[in-house]
Amino acid sequence: MFRMLAKASVTLGSRAASWVRNMGSHQLLVPPPEALSKPLSIPKRLLLGPGPSNLAPRVLAAGSLRMIGHMQKEMFQIMDEIKQGIQYVFQTRNPLTLVVSGSGHCAMETALFNLLEPGDSFLVGTNGIWGIRAAEIAERIGARVHQMIKKPGEHYTLQEVEEGLAQHKPVLLFLTHGESSTGVLQPLDGFGELCHRYQCLLLVDSVASLGGVPIYMDQQGIDILYSGSQKVLNAPPGISLISFNDKAKSKVYSRKTKPVSFYTDITYLSKLWGCEGKTRVIHHTLPVISLYCLRESLALISEQGLENSWRRHREATAHLHKCLRELGLKFFVKDPEIRLPTITTVTVPAGYNWRDIVSYVLDHFNIEISGGLGPSEDKVLRIGLLGYNATTENADRVAEALREALQHCPKNKL
């Protein structure tokens, strides 16, 4: 016995010596980066673009709280509180409600990867970039994608969608509630009931609308709803919220094939988030600090009340629109009834380069606004009054910045 231990010790010792010799035969060719020799410094800015938005002080403070393990009982309590907060802002009682460890794009993929199988018929409302993205993801899955293409700035009627449902017989319809690339608010009443008459599920993207616009997941018959953390909720970007009702859950759990993504497989995520009422099963390491922040952001909107949040966004944006009209700016969305109350799009004034305007507002006022995205690129300026930032004071500040930018930025007279 002792001889065997001694022999093992000699063997391990020779291996350790070999490792040391090998380490000595190599050199560090990459020096420590000079840029990392000093602490990080971030400029103070007012974020009035389409997102992310400024963090509320309480949310910002949550980011400096102590780390705990993601599979500890204290963390499970936080996760349960987050689930309750999501159920409140979604207005749903779905047990299968959780956070995806990834941005709104990841929530979109979570929905599509779990709901669609190769060969499934998928109907997409494409009136901005998010419909385009949903269609591309579904094509990669192998679904049969049918796009209802609209001009940027337009929305869908029940009649138009019914025609698509009757023609293509999809298993899933995708609509964007708040199309942040164009500034359109898509009405949702009646679409869930319509889809169900055609044995189709309704998937809604509410990344740019949640918290700023009324949405009622259960009452409006929405089968799958997702949103992001970084807009009205004023939490750090990088996590997203999602909920599946029983019809959607049944579709997921009766698949013939496994979802193409292990990371976003809802059958695993539901176990991690305790959605099945059983012992939680580890799937991946959760972004603990981001979840602290999301918990606090959901607490803030719960304390404020959804109806108060909706009203505040409506009033702040109405004031912004008044200021923009006084500047002579034209709204990209012509119909006032379908203008998104969280993100406003105005047409780039004739003769101006939108980049000059955005740069001037940032350089002289420390305010971030944005140009267009996807089909609205080079066509619009996007201004967001999101959550904590949705105030008439901020509307006045960005309007004054735009007024000065239009006076000083170069204008092409041709």
Curated annotation (Swiss-Prot):
GO terms for molecular function: alanine-glyoxylate transaminase activity; amino acid binding; identical protein binding; L-serine-pyruvate transaminase activity; protein homodimerization activity; pyridoxal phosphate binding; transaminase activity. SUPFAM superfamilies: PLP-dependent transferases (SSF53383). It is an enzyme of class 2 (transferase). The modification N6-(pyridoxal phosphate)lysine is found at K231. Its cofactor is pyridoxal 5'-phosphate. The keyword Mitochondrion applies. CDD domains: AGAT_like. It holds the Pfam family Aminotran_5. GO terms for biological process: glycine biosynthetic process, by transamination of glyoxylate; glyoxylate catabolic process; glyoxylate metabolic process; L-alanine catabolic process; L-cysteine catabolic process; L-serine metabolic process; Notch signaling pathway; oxalic acid secretion. InterPro entries: Aminotrans_V_dom (IPR000192), Aminotrans_V_PyrdxlP_BS (IPR020578), PyrdxlP-dep_Trfase (IPR015424), PyrdxlP-dep_Trfase_major (IPR015421), PyrdxlP-dep_Trfase_small (IPR015422), SP_NH2Trfase/AEP_transaminase (IPR024169). Its EC number is 2.6.1.44, 2.6.1.51. Keywords: Acetylation, Aminotransferase, Mitochondrion, Peroxisome, Pyridoxal phosphate, Transferase, Transit peptide. The modification N6-acetyllysine is found at K247, K256, K334. The modification N6-succinyllysine is found at K247. Residues 1-23 form a transit peptide. The keyword Zinc-finger does not apply. GO terms for cellular component: mitochondrial matrix; mitochondrion; peroxisomal matrix; peroxisome. Substrate binds at R382. A motif (Microbody targeting signal) lies at residues 412-414. Homodimer. Belongs to the class-V pyridoxal-phosphate-dependent aminotransferase family. This is Alanine--glyoxylate aminotransferase. It comes from Rattus norvegicus. The gene is Agxt.
